């Protein structure tokens, strides 16, 4: 688990979207919406987790430089894949949609 300081730093790195409150709404690396208060909520289409860009199984560490916010289904789909991986959720306007598994 990550402490609040790390969670906040990772959130701050997520993509801001014009005309949306960046304190509440951002997008992950796959283009899926995430909501700040939905951290760790796998029962939400807007839930997110902290992803290790360079997977721990390949020697990636917990330094913030190697961490990013990722919609939870995209994080599951990515798993230990690096550098290429597949997304399962992307945005369509202001909502998230299931896309199968698209190459990112």
Predicted regions and their residues:
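Short cysteine-rich loop/turn motifs with clustered Cys
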Residues: 2-48, 71
């Amino acid at each position: 688990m990550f402490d609040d300081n790390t969670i906040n730093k990772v959130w701050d790195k997520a993509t801001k979207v014009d005309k949306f409150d960046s304190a509440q709404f951002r997008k992950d690396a796959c283009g899926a919406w995430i909501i700040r208060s939905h951290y760790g909520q796998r029962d939400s289409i807007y839930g997110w987790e902290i992803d290790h860009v360079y997977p721990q199984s390949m020697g990636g560490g917990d330094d913030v430089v190697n961490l990013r916010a990722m919609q939870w289904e995209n994080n599951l789909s990515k798993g230990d894949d690096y550098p290429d991986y597949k997304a399962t959720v992307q945005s369509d306007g202001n909502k998230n949609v299931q896309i199968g598994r698209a190459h990112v």
